[in-house]
């Protein structure tokens, strides 16, 4: 399953999300959700304790002036790779 997180980690329950994910899932952070994968953040520490693949939309990182502040644990992707993720994961859950 592809989980898309578009809200700041301060306005969504990442712990609840992480109870649902498996090692076969992917989590894509976009819009304000990109703040969840900031280096040394509490939300990143939660995310690193699961086995899902982490992705972050590069355009949203740039738009928020967060270049260089995103953890290397999350892969920066563009819209083309976003489409690839939706094709790979037939089911999607917006968080």
From Swiss-Prot:
Q: Which UniProt keywords apply?
A: Cytoplasm, tRNA processing
Record Pfam families? DsrH
Gene3D superfamilies noted in UniProt: DsrEFH-like
Entry keyword Protein biosynthesis: no
Highest taxon in the source lineage: Bacteria
Q: Does the keyword tRNA processing apply?
A: yes
Q: Which InterPro entries match?
A: DsrEFH-like, Sulphur_relay_TusB, Sulphur_relay_TusB/DsrH
Indicate where this protein resides in the cell: Cytoplasm
State where it is primarily located: cytoplasm
GO process terms (BP): tRNA wobble position uridine thiolation
Q: Which GO terms describe its cellular component?
A: sulfurtransferase complex
Q: Give the quaternary structure.
A: Heterohexamer, formed by a dimer of trimers. The hexameric TusBCD complex contains 2 copies each of TusB, TusC and TusD. The TusBCD complex interacts with TusE.
The family this protein is said to belong to: Belongs to the DsrH/TusB family.
HAMAP family the record matches: Thiourid_synth_B
Could you tell me what this protein does?
A: Part of a sulfur-relay system required for 2-thiolation of 5-methylaminomethyl-2-thiouridine (mnm(5)s(2)U) at tRNA wobble positions.
Q: Entry's NCBIfam families? A: PRK13510.1 (NF010035), sulf_tusB_dsrH (TIGR03011)
User: What's the protein name?
Assistant: Protein TusB
Organism of origin is: Yersinia enterocolitica serotype O:8 / biotype 1B (strain NCTC 13174 / 8081)
The organism that produces this protein has a lineage beginning with:
Bacteria, Pseudomonadati, Pseudomonadota, Gammaproteobacteria, Enterobacterales
